[in-house]
Every structure is written in structure tokens, then in C-alpha cells.
Amino acid sequence: MTNIRKSHPLMKIINNSFIDLPAPSNISSWWNFGSLLGVCLMLQILTGLFLAMHYTSDTMTAFNSVTHICRDVSYGWTLRYLHANGASMFFICLYLHVGRGIYYGSYTYSETWNIGIILLFTVMATAFMGYVLPWGQMSFWGATVITNLLSAIPYIGTNLVEWIWGGFSVDKATLTRFFAFHFLFPFIISAMVMVHLLFLHETGSNNPMGIPSNVDMIPFHPYYTIKDILGVLLMIMVLSTLVLFSPDMLGDPDNYIPANPLNTPPHIKPEWYFLFAYAILRSIPNKLGGVLALTLSILILVIIPMLHMSKQRSMIFRPLSQCLFWLLVADLLILTWIGGQPVEHPYIIIGQLASILYFSIIIILMPLINFMENYLLKW
């Protein structure tokens, strides 16, 4: 008799995706972040669902409803901080996942890579809308500043902003629609994740060597299920420590002040995971230029496969490319730091130099180094 997991139509899909899936025998812990992202997404949907049961998307009561969740709902504070810090964990895993894709050349699977970029954009949009919901000072002013950037689009900009706001300023209509979209998007993300996995399983996983691994595959279960569970446990430990000991470490104190359209905070800044893009936006003293640079800072990932000039896929045997990769990582950390600083000397010039370096590394230096390495290897 055939095993039910191999014969049942639904079980067969699960079996071919998570149990009998042939996986390269040498993939390292850098390949754990896909499963960690799945866990983060499930955690966010679950905690978000329970938070939505108590939250009210009205400008008069939104701030108080979040306070009510923290004070009066049983374990409401845990839910709220798990959701807020879960978003931070989500982005840490996302950035590491993308970084691993760049380092090991996984971007050569173009369908998987492009769906991943769309996923990144969708998650960023979801996180931004979620940040507006508590209706604190930084929520309100963050929403005002970021949505206002669309007014830089010629001809239709102003109309577009007012259409998104649902009025002439960020108000009740804006909050209600942001809540609706924030609730809807994670389910769209879940569907896109399935497409992401579908494309990945068409080609099979990449591996640290960047060479075909068809000759040496092992079943996903039990080898990588055990490995993924270890990663999940470590992430839960970090998240629990954050939630239980310093839940507000990554947040902004200004968001504990109710939104006031008449009082602007001294430094308007987004959550920490958007600071690198915010620094790139601020480094250009022109509104439209800044918006274009902001969009391109993420959209540049699309052209990375086209700029791959090396005869080798992975960076594991390319020390010059490795140096450039880690320079890019350091540059992104500098941009993240600059994004949280006030707009004054010397932060302005540091931000501008870091922004130029960011685009230069990806567009100019990476392909040049690839050609150089090919020449050194006489290929």
C-alpha cells in the first residue's frame, strides 16, 4: 500500500515541498532564513489577528485602544510587543536572506529573485501602514511625510496624495484604509510566498559552492527540518528576550504621545529597518530626486542578475568580490545610522557619500571586479 503522504492529493503537495524535497547536502545556516521568515509571517498574522479584535481604527479612539490592549486585555501587552518586535525580526531575517542571495549568487534564479523583490516591497508597505495604526506622534507625522513624497510625481502627484489620504490631510479616512490594507496584505504576502516557493522548487536550491548539486541531494526531512527547528528556537529566544526585557528598545518614544497635527516632533524618522532608505532619500536636496533614489535603493536589486559578469556564481572563491560585498554591508549600516540622525553637519555629507558609495558598489564596482577576477583566472 502506498504511503498516504505520497498518494493523497493535498498531502502530496506538502510531501514534495517539505518532506521528500531533494535538497543540496551542503547548504549552510544561511539557508535557514527562508523558514524563519515563514515563522515570522505566521507569528505576525496570529498576533495581528488578536490585536485587530481589540483595535479601533478611529482617530479619536485608536491610541486609547492600543493602551487598552496593553493594560486591560489578558496578555495584551505580550501580543502588542510580539507584533511590534516580530516586525523587527522579520526585517532582520529579510535583509539577511537577501544578503545571502547576493553573496551566493542565488539571484541567477530570476523568477524566484523577482518574486522575492515584489515580496520585499509588499512587506515594507505593510510594515509602514502598521506603524501608522497606533496613532502616536511618529505614526501621524511618518504617514504625513512618507505619503507626501508622492506629490513629487509630476502632474498627478498632488491628486494622488489626496486620493490616498481620502481628504486634504492624514485623518480618519487614512487611518481606516491603512488598517484595512494592513489586515489584507499579509494574506496576499502568504499567497506570494507560495509562488516564491513554487519557482524555487522548479530549479532546486542553490548551495554555498554555487555549482549544480544534482549528484548529491538529501531529503529535506529529517535533515533540514531539524536544522530549521534549531534556527526557529534561537530566533524565538532572541524575540522573547526582546519582548520581555526591553520591548521598546527598537521603537520611538514619540509614539507614546497621541498624534497632534499642530505639534511637529523635532526629528521625524521611520522605524529602524527603513532608516537606510530614508538616509538615501534625505541625501538628495531635491524632492523628486530623493523619491527616485529611495525607490531605486530597493529596485536596484532587479538589475543585480544583469550586472553579474563573473564566470563563477558564488562569492565563496572570489575574495575581491567578498571585500566589496562586506563594504556594501558596512555602507548600509552607516546609512542606517545616518537615517536616525538630525539633518545637520557632518551627518549630511556622510549620508551623501554613503549613498553615492551604495549605488557605485552595485552598479560600477561589482561588475568591474567581476571582469578583473575573470581576467586573473584567465577565463
Curated annotation (Swiss-Prot):
Q: Which molecular-function annotation in GO is an example for this chain? A: ubiquinol-cytochrome-c reductase activity
User: Any idea where this protein resides?
Assistant: Mitochondrion inner membrane
Query: Which Pfam family, an example, fits this chain?
Result: Cytochrom_B_C
Which positions are annotated as binding a ubiquinone? 201
Reply yes or no: does the keyword Oxidoreductase apply: no
User: By its UniProt entry, which CDD domains does this protein fall under?
Assistant: cytochrome_b_C, Cytochrome_b_N
Q: Name one GO biological process term.
A: mitochondrial electron transport, ubiquinol to cytochrome c
Q: Which residues cross the membrane?
A: 33-53, 77-98, 113-133, 178-198, 226-246, 288-308, 320-340, 347-367
| Co-factor: note | Binds 2 heme b groups non-covalently.
Q: How does it sit in the membrane?
A: Multi-pass membrane protein
Q: What does this protein do?
A: Component of the ubiquinol-cytochrome c reductase complex (complex III or cytochrome b-c1 complex) that is part of the mitochondrial respiratory chain. The b-c1 complex mediates electron transfer from ubiquinol to cytochrome c. Contributes to the generation of a proton gradient across the mitochondrial membrane that is then used for ATP synthesis.
How this chain assembles, per its entry, is: The cytochrome bc1 complex contains 11 subunits: 3 respiratory subunits (MT-CYB, CYC1 and UQCRFS1), 2 core proteins (UQCRC1 and UQCRC2) and 6 low-molecular weight proteins (UQCRH/QCR6, UQCRB/QCR7, UQCRQ/QCR8, UQCR10/QCR9, UQCR11/QCR10 and a cleavage product of UQCRFS1). This cytochrome bc1 complex then forms a dimer.
| Protein's recorded name | Cytochrome b
